């Protein structure tokens, strides 16, 4: 059977494969379009398998939030190069995969691979995409968070697709939840930029805090040596690094020290109640450096750096007429924990021709 240019064009458009590959597949299939598609898929899958030993450390972080802000999904799909990450077909693949994960309630990569998308087993669909796009692609990780009637979730992905965040909040009422969606998205934007590791100091491991506190003091003392040499003001050396180190006894000790300071300054006791709260707030600010670095609630808000996220949430709760509490936080940064493979180009060429 004669293979026409129109047949090649049609097969190419339906599969995304190269022109010569389409022409050859049609020849092998004697012009049968369906058989030609199968032949290309078989060859494509073979090519995809060969690509699977190449590290995929570029790619995209994708976020999908349902219209009512009750469910949000974040995924990381890796490619080998940032060039492919900018490919509209790859971007569509990331978006479709994330939406499929959410709509199907998929929890694991194993579940994803055995699921069905557009009538095709996802694993087969994804390998076909690998063959068409021409690089190894990997669905590395994903997570979905959800909320009940009194909750709200939202998400944000930075414009370069390298960082994405989901945040979920429990609210005092459904009315507050409905009004809080945009605020939660703003918190996601903050977290994308400021990289908190956990929601609160309560989520930090105490042994980790103690080790970090020792390192922090050493860091500040070292810097103070240089500042002293230059005749510049020295850093304050904190007594603590996190609120998880400050219990009732520590707070009582700090309060007593403030009272003694006020007494030494000759401040009348009748005005201490007006002064002490501000000094306690300063005490916390000076002694929670680790919280400010690592916890969402302890960080100063990027849109108002005079207030912590915790303070901003309290203000928003009053504004909306009910309590808002952050209960879920997920942040993906592209390639976290992956080492980017550095290829020996000469060895790769030798392997291809040998």
From Swiss-Prot:
Stored SUPFAM superfamilies: Elongation factor Ts (EF-Ts), dimerisation domain, UBA-like
Primary localisation category: cytoplasm
GO CC term (a single one): cytoplasm
GO molecular function, one term: translation elongation factor activity
Gene3D superfamilies: 1.10.286.20, DNA helicase RuvA subunit, C-terminal domain, Elongation factor Ts, dimerisation domain
Similarity field: Belongs to the EF-Ts family.
Name of the molecule in the record: Elongation factor Ts
Organism annotation: Campylobacter concisus (strain 13826)
Lineage, broadest ranks: Bacteria, Pseudomonadati, Campylobacterota, Epsilonproteobacteria, Campylobacterales
């Amino acid at each position: 059977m004669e293979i026409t240019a129109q047949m090649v064009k049609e097969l190419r458009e339906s599969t995304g494969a190269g022109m010569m590959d389409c022409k050859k597949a049609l020849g092998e299939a004697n012009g049968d379009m369906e058989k030609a598609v199968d032949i290309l898929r078989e060859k494509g899958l073979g090519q995809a398998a060969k690509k699977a030993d190449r590290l995929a450390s570029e790619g995209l972080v994708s976020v999908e939030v349902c219209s009512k802000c009750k469910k949000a999904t974040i995924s990381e799909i890796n490619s080998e190069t940032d060039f492919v990450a900018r490919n509209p077909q790859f971007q569509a693949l990331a978006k479709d995969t994330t939406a499929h994960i959410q709509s199907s309630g998929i929890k694991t990569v194993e579940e994803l691979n055995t699921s069905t998308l557009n009538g095709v087993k996802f694993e087969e669909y994804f390998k076909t995409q690998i063959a068409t796009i021409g690089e190894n692609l990997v669905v590395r990780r994903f997570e979905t968070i959800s909320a009940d009637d009194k909750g709200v979730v939202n998400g944000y992905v930075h414009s370069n697709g390298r960082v994405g965040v989901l945040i979920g909040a429990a609210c005092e009422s459904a009315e507050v939840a409905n009004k809080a969606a945009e605020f939660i998205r703003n918190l996601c934007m903050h977290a994308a930029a400021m990289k908190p590791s956990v929601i609160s100091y309560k989520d930090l491991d105490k042994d980790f805090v103690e080790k970090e506190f020792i390192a922090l003091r050493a860091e500040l003392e070292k810097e103070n040596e240089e500042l002293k040499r230059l005749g510049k003001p020295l850093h304050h050396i904190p007594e603590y690094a996190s609120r998880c180190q400050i219990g009732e006894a520590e707070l009582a000790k700090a309060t007593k020290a403030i009272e003694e300071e006020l007494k030494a300054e000759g401040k009348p006791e009748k005005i201490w109640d007006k002064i002490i709260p501000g000094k306690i707030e300063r005490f916390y600010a000076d002694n929670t450096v680790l919280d400010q670095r690592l916890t969402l609630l302890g960080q100063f808000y990027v849109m108002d750096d005079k207030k912590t996220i915790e303070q901003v949430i309290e203000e928003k709760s009053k504004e909306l007429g009910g309590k808002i509490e952050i209960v879920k936080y997920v942040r993906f940064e592209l390639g976290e924990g992956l080492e980017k493979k550095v290829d020996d180009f000469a060895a790769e060429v030798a392997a291809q021709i040998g």
